[in-house]
């Protein structure tokens, strides 16, 4: 800790465009592709699709129909078959846009609300609330599709997203975060049975492949001495 600073130093920090004093971990951010495992779990849990359903190869650009005007969902890779595990490996925007449409607006809003969106996180430090829409309702079909790959109006607190990911390795239960180390601590559940054991296991296998499959977007952190799981994510501004 420092004992103080000059006014010149303080002004320089406050005027820095990179905002070094901004408490980023408490805020919400566009999750981008890190949101895809969440959509996968919602889709499987709601039986909107199965992990073996082939969504079809659309190339690098897709729109549902002409009512979308000039708007297209784009992706970087083509592959076959277009099933859930491969969609996670290649981080396919088009697959997850289609997945969101299959889930539907009502189920998407219900499931995300159940996962703690538009609600406070049970944590010692107050965090900004994650949200799937500016007004708690997904307004359009394009907005729903964009939600599927972590864009649209979706904003997520990083701690909240990490909590949801705990469900994939805890039989579908979302664990409660805590700040201070506890000796021999036992995990506390925040959201019990958010997903079934089979759904959480299927998503876990998918995000293991993201890291351990040579085509996976997270293969750079692959290790031979342990099995890692995760999901890459890059948000974009269109």
Model-derived regions, located:
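Beta-lactam-recognizing serine transpeptidase/beta-lactamase-like catalytic domain environment
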Residues: 1-33, 38-238
């Amino acid at each position: 800790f420092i004992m103080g600073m000059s006014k010149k130093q303080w002004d320089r920090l406050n005027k820095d465009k990179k905002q070094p004093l901004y408490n980023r971990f408490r805020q919400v951010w566009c999750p981008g592709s890190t949101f895809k495992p969440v959509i996968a779990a919602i889709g499987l849990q709601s039986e909107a699709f199965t992990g073996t359903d082939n969504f079809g190869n659309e190339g690098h650009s897709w729109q549902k129909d002409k009512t979308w005007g000039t708007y297209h969902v784009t992706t970087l890779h083509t592959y076959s078959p277009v099933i859930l595990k491969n969609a996670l490996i290649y981080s396919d925007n088009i697959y997850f846009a289609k997945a969101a449409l299959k889930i539907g607006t009502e189920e998407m809003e219900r499931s995300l609300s159940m996962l703690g969106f538009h609600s406070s996180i049970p944590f010692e430090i107050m965090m900004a609330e994650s949200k799937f829409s500016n007004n708690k309702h997904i307004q359009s079909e394009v907005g729903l599709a964009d939600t599927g790959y972590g864009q649209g109006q979706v904003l997520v607190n990083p701690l909240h997203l990490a909590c949801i990911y705990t469900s994939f390795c805890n039989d579908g239960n979302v664990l409660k975060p805590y700040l201070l180390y506890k000796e021999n601590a036992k995990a506390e559940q925040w959201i019990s049975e958010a997903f079934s054991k089979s759904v959480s296991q299927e998503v876990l296998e998918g995000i293991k492949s993201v890291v351990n499959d040579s085509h996976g977007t997270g293969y750079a952190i692959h290790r031979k001495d342990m099995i890692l799981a995760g999901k890459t994510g890059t948000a974009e501004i269109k």
